[in-house]
């Protein structure tokens, strides 16, 4: 019986550090952000759906999605925002489901990294949910270093997300990513041993 583990956490919580480590250990990881990127690439299903809806004005000269223009159009009205969410979420969910079902045929244990796993009701897909937990101070520090955000921008990004405490209710396992990378890897190793022995 395949075990499917969902990985989630707030922005700059260190999900990619953990998923890269899982890949190094030989596990398959479906990355929702990468799936979205693939779908939005020229000719992808999301690309086609957005062009059909909003027209070629959302494309740049190379024929790729002009993300600033797209954001401007989507966020210009509540109706556009609602339609965009509905359209994109349906296509993304279908693609994630297809990839999940493919891996379930060949893998004993695999992982899916979905940043909005809890908020967008993916919970029933998983045997377990791992929440990557870090302090808001750590997230802000990483956002400033990694994304070049100001203190205010970083705080705004955090404020727009579901709080960690609210997410903890849905988590089966919590990986504390406040300390060193080595410490985090030790926690992951411990969880992997437990999964393999069950």
UniProtKB/Swiss-Prot annotation:
Catalyzes the phosphorylation of the 3'-hydroxyl group of dephosphocoenzyme A to form coenzyme A. Its EC number is 2.7.1.24. Disulfide bonds: none annotated. Keywords: ATP-binding, Coenzyme A biosynthesis, Cytoplasm, Kinase, Nucleotide-binding, Transferase. NCBIfam families: dephospho-CoA kinase (TIGR00152). It is found in: Cytoplasm. GO terms for cellular component: cytoplasm. Its main location: cytoplasm. ATP binds at residues 12-17. This is Dephospho-CoA kinase. GO terms for biological process: coenzyme A biosynthetic process. Residues 4-198 form the DPCK domain. Pfam families: CoaE. The keyword Transferase applies. Gene3D superfamilies: P-loop containing nucleotide triphosphate hydrolases. PROSITE patterns: DPCK. The gene is coaE. Transmembrane segments: none annotated. It catalyses: 3'-dephospho-CoA + ATP = ADP + CoA + H(+). Belongs to the CoaE family.
């Amino acid at each position: 019986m395949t075990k499917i583990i969902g990985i989630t956490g707030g922005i700059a919580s260190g999900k990619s550090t953990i998923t890269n480590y899982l890949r190094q250990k030989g596990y398959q990881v479906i990355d929702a952000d990468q799936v979205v990127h693939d779908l939005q690439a020229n000719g992808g299903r999301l690309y086609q759906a957005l062009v059909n809806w909003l027209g070629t004005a959302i494309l740049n000269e190379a024929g790729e999605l002009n993300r600033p223009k797209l954001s401007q159009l989507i966020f210009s009205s509540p109706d556009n925002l609602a339609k965009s969410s509905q359209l994109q979420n349906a296509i993304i969910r279908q693609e994630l489901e297809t990839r999940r079902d493919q891996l379930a045929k060949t893998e004993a244990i695999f992982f899916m990294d979905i940043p909005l796993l809890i908020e967008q009701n993916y919970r029933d897909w998983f045997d377990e949910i791992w929440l990557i937990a870090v302090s808001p101070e750590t997230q802000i520090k990483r956002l400033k270093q990694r994304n070049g955000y100001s203190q205010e921008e970083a705080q705004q990004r955090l404020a727009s997300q579901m709080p960690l405490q609210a997410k903890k209710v849905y988590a089966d396992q919590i990986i504390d990513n406040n300390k060193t990378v080595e410490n985090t890897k030790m926690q992951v190793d411990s969880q992997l041993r437990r999964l393999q022995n069950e």
